[in-house]
Amino acid sequence: MKLNVSYPATGCQKLFEVVDEHKLRVFYEKRMGQVVEADILGDEWKGYQLRIAGGNDKQGFPMKQGVLTHGRVRLLLKKGHSCYRPRRTGERKRKSVRGCIVDANMSVLALVVLKKGEKDIPGLTDTTIPRRLGPKRASKIRKLYNLSKEDDVRRFVVRRPLPAKDNKKATSKAPKIQRLITPVVLQRKHRRIALKKKRQIASKEASADYAKLLVQRKKESKAKREEAKRRRSASIRESKSSVSSDKK
């Protein structure tokens, strides 16, 4: 079985191939997310604690968190589920995934170093790979440098150096800070609120005018009906009087 071990503190990961079955028994019947003491893997692993992050079986099917079996199952997956990437909007698909329990049929096991031991492991804990990009969101930059709301975040942005080309001076590039509160942002917000209030007032006035117009139209229609009723009653009286005069 191969062990793909990553160490977030240095940003490194390394693939180890373990042939001895006895060394791997410490991982068997363990679930994803469980912490394992790695002393049995060798002297250089003494004191290390590893968390099981996932893995693939010998046919390439991935482990899925929450599936409490060591075998393979077919699940109906949709957007947001692990082990599946939808190609169309709203698409669902039945996919074969492996349970979250480790057994001997695993090909690769993904592990994360939670606690470093006594010795360094070459290529994993002795070298540090610097992050290519720094944080972009204003709140995360504040969290990284422990800044208050009064501090200017723009001075603390991690700039990325660009190599010099065509006999030009080397430059650096900074990301656009997201969710940064500036006077322009506040101005736009106040404008949005003012427009919303203006629309509300205009809507209230329009509804009041419509209510007045509705009352006026009802009065007019009522007056028309009463006028028509009077005319009908007057014409009926006239017809009755003409009939009675003819009889005489």
UniProtKB/Swiss-Prot annotation:
Composition-biased stretches, type Basic and acidic residues, lie in: 223-248
Q: Where in the cell is it found?
A: Cytoplasm; Nucleus, Nucleolus
- Point out the gene that encodes the protein: RpS6
The principal localisation class reads cytoplasm
Name of the protein in question: Small ribosomal subunit protein eS6
UniProt function note = Component of the 40S small ribosomal subunit. Plays an important role in controlling cell growth and proliferation through the selective translation of particular classes of mRNA. Part of the small subunit (SSU) processome, first precursor of the small eukaryotic ribosomal subunit.
Keyword set, alphabetical order: Cytoplasm, Nucleus, Phosphoprotein, Ribonucleoprotein, Ribosomal protein
Posttranslational mods? Ribosomal protein S6 is the major substrate of protein kinases in eukaryote ribosomes. The phosphorylation is stimulated by growth factors, tumor promoting agents, and mitogens. It is dephosphorylated at growth arrest.
Family indicated by similarity: Belongs to the eukaryotic ribosomal protein eS6 family.
